[in-house]
Amino acid sequence: MSINIKAVTDDNRAAILDLHVSQNQLSYIESTKVCLEDAKECHYYKPVGLYYEGDLVGFAMYGLFPEYDEDNKNGRVWLDRFFIDERYQGKGLGKKMLKALIQHLAELYKCKRIYLSIFENNIHAIRLYQRFGFQFNGELDFNGEKVMVKEL
């Protein structure tokens, strides 16, 4: 099983821009076009393509943001955007990619926690995150989404 997390570059940008979620998921996450624009405006964001067996199957965006965190004085590590392309959903890739992303972020940032935010009606995603140990911490982000945190 080959999983790779690759930065968005000129070589894969067009393919990344072609990724999309299903129609019923559009209200939960921004398009890759919007994500890449956000990353251009905010240097904390690191957009990446998610590859399985050489195929681009998803997208994520993460970063170390300069908010106070009791265990990391440099800030909080956020998994800000994450999705599997509609064409690859229902094949267990969400679990595989989330596991790889958690490991990647833990190694990259040497962090003790990973944060994310989610709309409370995104039940499928909440269940996935809970299976991987993410729990609601009582906070809301600036968009009113509920914050979840995973202790590493």
Swiss-Prot record:
Active site, UniProt feature: Y129
Matches recorded under PROSITE patterns: GNAT
EC primary class: transferase
Cysteine pairings via disulfide bonds: none
GO biological process: spermidine catabolic process; spermine catabolic process
SUPFAM superfamilies on file: Acyl-CoA N-acyltransferases (Nat)
Gene Ontology MF terms in the entry: diamine N-acetyltransferase activity
Family annotation (InterPro entries): Acyl_CoA_acyltransferase (IPR016181), GNAT_dom (IPR000182), MshD_Acetyltransferase (IPR050276), Sper_AcTfrase_N (IPR027455)
Catalytic activity: an alkane-alpha,omega-diamine + acetyl-CoA = an N-acetylalkane-alpha,omega-diamine + CoA + H(+); spermine + acetyl-CoA = N(1)-acetylspermine + CoA + H(+); spermidine + acetyl-CoA = N(1)-acetylspermidine + CoA + H(+)
Superkingdom, taxonomy of origin: Bacteria
Record keywords, A-Z: Acyltransferase, Transferase
Domain N-acetyltransferase: 3-152
Regulation: Putrescine and N(8)-acetylspermidine are competitive inhibitors of spermidine acetylation.
Binding-site residues, acetyl-CoA: 82-84, 89-95, 122-131
Pathway as given in its UniProt record: Amine and polyamine degradation; spermine degradation; Amine and polyamine degradation; spermidine degradation
Gene3D superfamilies (UniProt xref): 3.40.630.30, The crystal structure of the spermine/spermidine acetyltransferase from enterococcus faecali
Job description of the protein: Acetylates both spermidine and spermine at primary propyl amine moieties, with spermine being the preferred substrate.
Family: Belongs to the acetyltransferase family.
Protein name: Spermine/spermidine N(1)-acetyltransferase
Organism: Bacillus subtilis (strain 168)
Upper taxonomic lineage: Bacteria, Bacillati, Bacillota, Bacilli, Bacillales
